[in-house]
């Protein structure tokens, strides 16, 4: 088996769509909105594509997405592309795959996470009229202020407001709860929720459930699969998502990785 660089969207998508729930993020990154920030590598055996990983450069730090149900193949691919990896990057890795990098890299573990997707036929609660509003790109400044207090250290890309798929609740002119997307692609029929947070003073009032439900209803008009990532020890968030109809589909680990 050998590795190759992949440049054909159709070939990548044909492979990834075999397990949409696991690969919502990389599938969404095939969209023209994200594609310029991507590098793709594949493991090939007798001309057949056996595994795919993605390096995404759309954030301040590159992010490696290396997720698979077949960790042996994923291990083999990562072993081959190790010399091509940047000196420092963030990573989403299937369980135990990190072992292939431990001899050449220093790894800082950021916890076990799980992937969840919204089950078909889920009943999403309706918010009161005008309680939740769609957030425009013009409100980027107010959104950044909200996240500094409510979700410090989060991965917020202001470009994502251009998708029109951010929703929030305001009080006194300021946001007190927001739900958004990390990935959104009607072309590839997927969306990944992200940056869901409530101001500390307004938690435990069901606001995150309201904004997330509103956003899911909006997204379901455009895409067929909605997913999200959440830390396994974030019990309140998981309870909120289960209430809305999300189900667990996989576990993975997040790391900051640097060459030794």
Each model region followed by its residue ranges:
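Acyl-donor-binding surface of acyltransferase catalytic domains
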Residues: 56-128
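Conserved donor-binding loop and adjoining core beta-sheet/short helix segment
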Residues: 1, 20, 27-81, 179-194
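Conserved acetyl-CoA-binding loop-helix of GNAT-fold acetyltransferases
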Residues: 71-81, 198, 204-220, 238-243
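Conserved beta-strand-loop-alpha-helix junction that forms the acyl-donor binding cleft
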Residues: 91-98, 228-238, 254-260
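Conserved active-site tyrosine of GNAT-family acetyltransferases
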Residues: 101-102, 240-241, 246
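Acetyl-CoA-dependent GNAT
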Residues: 46-47, 55-60, 140, 145, ...
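Short amphipathic alpha-helix that is part of the acyltransferase structural core
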Residues: 1-24, 120-154
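Conserved catalytic-core motifs of GNAT/GCN5-like acyltransferases
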Residues: 108-119, 247-260
């Amino acid at each position: 088996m050998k590795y190759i660089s992949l440049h054909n969207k159709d070939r990548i998508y044909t492979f990834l769509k075999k397990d949409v729930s696991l690969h919502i993020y990389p599938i969404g990154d095939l969209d023209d909105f994200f594609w310029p920030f991507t590098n793709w590598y594949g493991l090939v055996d007798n001309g057949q594509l056996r595994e795919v990983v993605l390096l995404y450069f759309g954030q301040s730090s590159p992010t490696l997405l290396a997720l698979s149900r077949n960790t042996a193949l994923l291990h083999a691919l990562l072993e081959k592309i190790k010399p091509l990896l940047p000196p420092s990057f963030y990573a989403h890795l299937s369980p135990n795959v990190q072992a292939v990098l431990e001899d050449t890299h220093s790894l800082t573990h950021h916890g076990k996470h799980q992937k969840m997707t919204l089950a078909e036929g889920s009943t999403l609660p309706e918010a009161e009229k005008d309680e939740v509003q769609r957030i425009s790109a013009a409100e980027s400044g107010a959104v950044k202020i909200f996240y500094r207090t409510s979700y410090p250290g989060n991965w917020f890309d202001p470009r994502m407001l251009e998708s029109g798929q951010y929703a929030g609740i305001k009080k006194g002119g300021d946001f007190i709860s927001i739900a958004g997307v990390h990935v959104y692609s009607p072309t590839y029929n997927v969306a990944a929720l992200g940056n869901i947070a409530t101001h500390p003073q307004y938690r435990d009032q069901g606001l995150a459930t309201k904004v997330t439900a509103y956003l899911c209803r909006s997204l379901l008009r455009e895409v067929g699969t909605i997913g999200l990532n959440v830390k396994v020890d974030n019990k309140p968030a998981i309870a909120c998502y289960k209430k809305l109809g999300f189900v667990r589909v996989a576990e993975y680990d997040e790391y900051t990785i640097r060459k030794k």
